[in-house]
Amino acid sequence: MMAVALMCCSPIMAQKKHSGMCAKQAMQADGIVRLSKIEVHPQYLDEYMKFATEVGEVSLRTEPGVLTMYAVNDKENPCLITILETYASQEAYKQHIASAHFQKYKQGTLHMVKSLQLCDQKPLNPANQLNNYME
């Protein structure tokens, strides 16, 4: 499995191509910073993680407007998953959720998800940009 790491970078860096990824757009004024809080039924956790890993990797590799996909799970309860997602713009998000790889993830995991909260965030320092890179 590939390691996914998170790094901070300037808006100029956000436009550069990182190893294994397409060139990234800079965050626009209407960009999205979101925490997706997901609770997965325990019996589906392993299967869910396969879907989530695939959609994250494909999104970062192929979608210029998907800037960050960083998933973590709770140390005490691994069925509680939080994903930090950043999108360059509202349009980039619309393109992401319409993509074949996202639809495969969404339809394939509907029965696995016990609860979902989408929590949009406001950056404290908009000059800081987040971007992922893959090794």
Describe each PLM feature range.
Residues 1-9:
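Bacterial N-terminal signal peptides
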Residues 24-54:
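N-terminal targeting signals for Sec/Tat export/insertion, comprising classic cleavable signal peptides
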